[in-house]
């Protein structure tokens, strides 16, 4: 899980979602998980 000031999709399967007021990227590839913070 990366914590970045700006989250971007890395591949086609990445999805940007909002959860509990935080922007997240979820993906099949665990290396692509990100949260904005």
From Swiss-Prot:
GO terms for molecular function: structural constituent of ribosome. Keywords: Ribonucleoprotein, Ribosomal protein. The keyword Transport does not apply. One of its GO terms (cellular component) is ribonucleoprotein complex. GO terms for biological process: translation. The keyword Ribonucleoprotein applies. It comes from the Bacteria. InterPro entries: Ribosomal_bL36 (IPR000473), Ribosomal_bL36_sp (IPR035977). Belongs to the bacterial ribosomal protein bL36 family. This is Large ribosomal subunit protein bL36A.
């Amino acid at each position: 899980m990366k914590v970045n000031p700006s989250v971007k999709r890395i591949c086609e399967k990445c999805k940007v979602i909002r959860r509990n007021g935080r922007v997240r990227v979820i993906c099949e590839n665990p290396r692509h998980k990100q949260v904005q913070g």
